[in-house]
A protein has these predicted regions:
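Short aromatic-enriched loop/helix-cap "lid" or pocket-rim segments at secondary-structure transitions
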Residues: 1-2, 71-74, 112, 185-188
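Core catalytic region of metal-dependent phosphoesterases/phosphodiesterases
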Residues: 2-95, 157-170, 193-201
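His/acidic metal-ligating clusters that form di-metal
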Residues: 15-28, 52, 116-185
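Catalytic metal-binding/acid-base residues of hydrolase active sites
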Residues: 35-36, 64-66, 105-106, 150-152, ...
Length: 203
């Protein structure tokens, strides 16, 4: 992670120190992706163990670098790490009277064709809707969205992600992926149409 700037130097130790200073076993934390550079579960195990050993209830969202996590294997991961970690994909978790819903998301960064981008974004919207509907079926009507990618592409005033947030009357949209101060304003921050947008990248 040092490639993203000096503040990432010794980032593991910094995160551990700050986490243990602020988080207790009674807290719920959603980590919005990029948990490991590991290409498979064996390679990612050390990083996941690091997270497991931190205090609090930990809910993990899939990031673009999480090669160990195939979306189709989410239930397998939940079974494997039961009581230790919770994996958020095509499902939801509760926090007080809120349903925590989420998906990786997608925005256009110029690395693929528009057609491919639109296909992937539509797939992510479909997955997010599955989360919403699972929560609704369980009786929830208050929602917080978690994404890995920002909810809009640079320059967009809205997107399918902001529209679905309005459709389900969510209170917050929390996302990451944007590293380095030059990228902190890539998408919405603060209140837009009554919804609070928060960038929570590690830096």
């Amino acid at each position: 992670m040092d490639i993203f700037g000096r503040r990432w130097k010794n980032h593991v130790a910094k995160i551990e120190k700050n986490w243990k200073k602020k988080i207790t076993s009674k807290d719920t934390i959603v980590l919005t992706g990029d948990h490991s550079w590991g290409r498979n579960l064996d390679e990612a195990q050390e990083d996941l163990n690091f997270i497991i050993n931190l205090p609090g209830r930990k809910i993990l969202l899939r990031g673009n670098h999480d090669m160990f996590w195939d979306a189709k294997k989410t239930q397998k991961l939940n079974n494997l790490f039961q009581g230790k970690l919770e994996f958020l994909q095509n499902n939801f978790y509760n926090y007080q009277d809120y349903a925590l819903v989420g998906t990786k998301g997608y925005c256009y960064e110029g690395k693929d064709s528009i057609e491919h981008f639109l296909k992937l974004r539509t797939r992510e919207i479909d997955r997010l809707r599955v989360s919403f509907e699972a929560a609704r079926t369980a009786g929830y009507d208050k929602f917080i969205i978690f994404l890995h990618y920002p909810p809009t592409t640079i320059g967009e005033q809205d997107s399918p992600f902001t529209k679905i947030a309005l459709e389900y009357n969510v209170s917050k949209v929390i996302y990451s992926h944007c590293h380095g101060e030059e990228r902190f304003d890539d998408s919405f921050k603060g209140y837009v149409d009554g919804i609070e947008y928060k960038l929570v990248s590690g830096d």
